[in-house]
């Protein structure tokens, strides 16, 4: 059985997501990849195997807009030709592939096609008009793809149950979210210039989005006298959607964080915070666990494993008072045992072999 892993996007966490899955099959010569990257060349830098094809497409505003209506013909043609060349039996579309809905459905008539659903529902967001339009069109295309394929994969147990209710006649599969740790992160030791002399901070890491509830932890560190004596670092690109002022104990690094900076950023943090209002799945837990940094996360379904596996504590989603109290409790606690558990959890749950075996079982059903 010849398998093709497809990713046409490396935006946000999709690059690490796809490359980690592809790298899980590094030794399998019957598993190929077909990926499309932009000027960041994420896949070229992180995929270990040469058993595939990498195409290039600029991440311009024009390309983003036109892709909502017309997928690049050259890429569609190349994908179909590659499937024939390698005598592919199974195709797994890893990263939504928003513009390629018709192509995916068409291929599902000739191949065994799997499609990974990342976010079944749109997250809370404050966006300008053209971004709202693009967002709406994107989710419309994703809905078409879900309707048109027979095999759907998700990394969220709650989403798995919802998909089974929505599509009782389809095959719905679950596998654990892969680690977002790549070789650029493990080998990197670049210090963010904004953190000169700053140590033992509480870290929020990730793109700033409304559904991630960043304003909750910001307000907690602004208003509580004890938290005012501690440092909060908010690190990630994206539009700051809430009013923010300059405080000595709050450092905002509002830019893209290079992979080479992530090790320093986490190694010098005391703990990590994820105050999400909603979340179906996320790879951020793998990063905290890899570096052994205790977690404070909201109790939305995906993050409830934090308390279950003793990797930190959960607070009631959207509740600033509960978040504040949990922060104050954990900041004065001995965190060494949690750190050890996190690293053990990472080794047993985020290994490449675990991902490989899970997917092979799915493909063979």
Q: For the regions a protein language model found, what residue spans apply to each?
A:
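Short N-terminal targeting/anchoring amphipathic segment
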Residues: 5-6, 70-71, 79-100, 111-114, ...
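Nucleotide-activated donor-binding/catalytic signature segment of Leloir-type glycosyltransferases, i.e.
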Residues: 241-263
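Conserved acidic donor-binding segment of nucleotide-sugar-dependent glycosyltransferases
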Residues: 252, 309-321, 327-335
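Acidic donor-binding loop of glycosyltransferase active sites
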Residues: 264-280, 290-293
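Conserved donor-binding/catalytic core segment of Leloir-type glycosyltransferases
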Residues: 194-212, 218-221, 232
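Membrane-proximal helix-turn-helix segments that form the acceptor-binding/catalytic region
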Residues: 80, 132-152
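Donor nucleotide-sugar binding/catalytic pocket of nucleotide-sugar-dependent glycosyltransferases
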Residues: 147-187
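N-terminal strand-loop element at the rim of the active site
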Residues: 7-12, 23-70, 97, 159-164, ...
